[in-house]
Every structure is written in structure tokens, then in C-alpha cells.
């Protein structure tokens, strides 16, 4: 739920094999004995090592105390693991770039911002890759639709925008990212300390080596880029193998669908409807809420029936030559629970629609 990246296209089976950030054990793998309350580590990570980038960091020491007292972690092993974590200045810089700013003035008129954003995701090659993903995991997508009520195009749209259907899941060690942000980023240290706590619990429960798992610079994981807290609340074992693996596309499909259901997705309902007319005098955005009669009084009419909806948010998209207005319905708002952005939600929806259309052509 962070990041935007682009790569050249390769055959799907090559890409999915290459990008997996959760190594699979083989018959020749050996693991060391696991102390009570500890992790199942690979031999190269089971070292008697003290020091490291966070050795004298009081926040790190307080975190270790909490994990031992609250969750029963093995203190020595946890110290050894954190001593192998790296402080990543690049992560701190990227987070600063994500910070909200009030110094940039909004454009005085339309400049095509929506079109530029849309072109990052909705391209012929990307749509075709979405078709391949949908076809490969059609059974899981249809099952998620039946179980959670979320249609395949929404799940495909989310995974496409987040990771190009698994092609770009991040190359940063999650432990490094979350430790850096927990111990050296005061502005959001409390939040990321909670994410690190949940990440280590996940690794212990799933018997993963926490030093092996990779994701985004902010610690987002797998096909759907779940943060550890989202894993804890919404991730599911959709493949039925007894493990929750966000780097497994089937588990990711079920987890994304469960996330949407939990955030109010209404099965079979509309997402948004384009409007005729302009309403420059009304505040816009996915957080707004107007009665349909208010929008009509402002000069807007829906291009398609709105069903039984009596209220909508007013969405405005900058298309360069002017503004495009939309009625945002509750399912549109649900998409924004994944990423709080009108552009993001519209890109997810339209990408999924484009892939669905391409499958039948």
C-alpha cells in the first residue's frame, strides 16, 4: 500500500519465480534448534553477534523488553536478529518524501493530472499482463467472489496497481525497513514499532526467518502489499495449506477480498457513475457527501442510473482540457480504504474494468 514501480515485461512464470520474496524451504535446507519463544532461523542467521546499527539505540532496547515481556520472545535471539538489521537512510529519505506538505500550491486550472496518473497503470501491455494473471488464477478469483462478494476485476485491479500482479513486490528487507522506521524515525515511530511487533509475531507464527522476507521500503508485503497490521486483521489462508502467505497469489487474492468485505464492500453494487455537467462551486473528493438532489441543483446529472442511492461523493478528475465529474458511491469509498486517494481508487477500478474487457475481446 505504498510504492509505484515499473519494469520491462518478461514471461509470467519467470517473473513470478524471480520476484517471490518469501523463500521456500527445500529438502536440503537445515534449520537450527529454536529456543522457547524464538524464531526458526536459517543457519547463516543463527549467529552469536552483538552490536549492529541499533546496538545503543534506547528505542530498540525498549522494544526488545516489550517483546520479551509481552510475547515471550527469547531475548538473546531477538537481540541477535536485531543486531543483523540495517539502518537504511534511503528508507528515511523516502518516508520524508511521503510526508504531507502544504508548501505546494494547487494548480490554478486543469493540467491533466489524472491522465498522467492513469497512464502509469492502464497501458496495453499492463492490461494484457492482467489478463494472464486473471486467467491463471480464475478459480481463486471466482471463489473469492463467492465467499466475500468482491468481483474479480476489483481484486485484479488492486494487485495490478500495487505490484503489477507480483512483478514488483519490493526488494527491501522488511526487518531493516521496519527497524529503521521504528527506532530512527520519531515522527511515526509509534506506528512502525507496532508494525515491527506484528511482523515479528507473524514470522514466528509462520516459522519464517524474519531476515529473509522482503517488501517495500515501508514494510508492505506480498502481492497486495499488506502492512503487518493488515496481515494480522485481514489475511487469510485461502489456499488451504495451513499457512498464510502473502507472497502466494491465492492467499493474496483471498486476503484482498476479505479486506474489502471488512471495509464495507457491497456485493453487486456500483462503484462510480460519470456525471454530465460541471460543479466548480462544490468541494470535491472521496470524503465529500451530497444528496443526489444537491448535485442536481449544482448542474450535474448521472450518465447512468444510480439505483437506489440517495447520496454520493463528488469526484473531480483533471483531464487536461477540463474536469470530469463523477458520482462516487459507497463501493468507491471502500476502495479508498486501501489507499486514501481518489486517483488510486479510480485507477484500481478502471484497470480492473480494462482487464475484464480485454479478456472477452
Curated annotation (Swiss-Prot):
Q: Quote the SUPFAM superfamilies the UniProt record gives.
A: Lysozyme-like
Gene Ontology, cellular component aspect: cell outer membrane; outer membrane-bounded periplasmic space
Residue numbers with lipid attached (N-palmitoyl cysteine)? 19
**Residue numbers with lipid attached (S-diacylglycerol cysteine):** 19
- In the UniProt record, the signal sequence range is 1-18
Give the reaction(s) catalysed.
Answer: Exolytic cleavage of the (1->4)-beta-glycosidic linkage between N-acetylmuramic acid (MurNAc) and N-acetylglucosamine (GlcNAc) residues in peptidoglycan, from either the reducing or the non-reducing ends of the peptidoglycan chains, with concomitant formation of a 1,6-anhydrobond in the MurNAc residue
Biological role: Murein-degrading enzyme. Catalyzes the cleavage of the glycosidic bonds between N-acetylmuramic acid and N-acetylglucosamine residues in peptidoglycan. May play a role in recycling of muropeptides during cell elongation and/or cell division.
The entry describes its oligomerization and partners as:
Monomer.
Protein name in UniProt: Membrane-bound lytic murein transglycosylase B
User: Which gene is the coding source of this polypeptide chain?
Assistant: mltB
Amino acid at each position: 500500500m505504498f510504492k509505484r514501480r515499473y519494469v520491462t515485461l518478461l514471461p509470467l512464470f519467470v517473473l513470478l519465480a524471480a520476484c517471490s520474496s518469501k523463500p521456500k524451504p527445500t529438502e536440503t535446507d537445515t534449520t537450527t534448534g529454536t529456543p522457547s519463544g524464538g524464531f526458526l532461523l536459517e543457519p547463516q542467521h543463527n549467529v552469536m553477534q552483538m552490536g549492529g546499527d541499533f546496538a545503543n539505540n534506547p528505542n530498540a532496547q525498549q522494544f526488545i523488553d516489550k517483546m520479551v515481556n509481552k510475547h515471550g520472545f527469547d531475548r538473546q535471539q531477538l537481540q541477535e536478529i536485531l543486531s543483523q538489521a540495517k539502518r537504511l537512510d534511503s528508507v528515511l529519505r523516502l518516508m520524508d518524501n511521503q510526508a504531507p506538505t502544504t508548501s505546494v500550491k494547487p494548480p490554478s486550472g486543469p493540467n491533466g493530472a489524472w491522465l498522467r496518473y492513469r497512464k502509469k497503470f492502464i497501458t496495453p501491455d499492463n492490461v494484457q499482463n492482467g489478463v494472464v494473471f486473471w486467467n491463471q488464477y480464475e478459480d481463486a478469483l471466482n471463489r473469492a467472489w463467492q465467499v466475500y462478494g468482491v468481483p474479480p476485476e476489483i481484486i485484479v485491479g488492486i494487485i495490478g496497481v500495487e505490484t503489477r500482479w507480483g512483478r514488483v513486490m519490493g526488494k527491501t528487507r522488511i526487518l531493516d525497513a521496519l527497524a529503521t522506521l521504528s527506532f530512527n524515525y520519531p515522527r511515526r515511530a509509534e506506528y512502525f514499532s507496532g508494525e515491527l511487533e506484528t511482523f515479528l509475531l507473524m514470522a514466528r507464527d509462520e516459522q519464517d526467518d524474519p531476515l529473509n522476507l522482503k517488501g517495500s521500503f515501508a514494510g508492505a508485503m506480498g502481492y497486495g502489499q499488506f502492512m503487518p497490521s493488515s496481515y494480522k486483521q485481514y489475511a487469510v489462508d485461502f489456499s488451504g495449506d495451513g499457512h498464510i502467505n502473502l507472497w502466494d497469489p491465492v492467499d493474496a487474492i483471498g486476503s484482498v477480498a476479505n479486506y474489502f468485505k471488512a471495509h464495507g464492500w457491497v456485493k453487486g453494487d456500483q462503484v462510480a457513475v460519470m456525471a454530465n455537467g460541471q460543479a466548480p462551486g462544490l468541494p470535491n473528493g472521496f470524503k465529500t457527501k451530497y444528496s443526489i438532489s444537491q448535485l442536481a441543483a449544482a448542474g450535474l446529472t448521472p450518465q447512468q442510473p444510480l439505483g437506489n442511492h440517495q447520496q454520493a461523493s463528488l469526484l473531480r478528475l483533471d483531464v487536461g482540457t477540463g474536469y470530469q465529474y463523477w458520482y462516487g458511491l459507497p463501493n468507491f469509498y471502500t476502495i479508498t480504504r486501501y489507499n486514501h486517494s481518489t486517483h488510486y481508487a479510480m485507477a484500481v477500478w478502471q484497470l480492473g474494468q480494462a482487464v475484464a474487457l480485454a479478456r472477452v475481446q
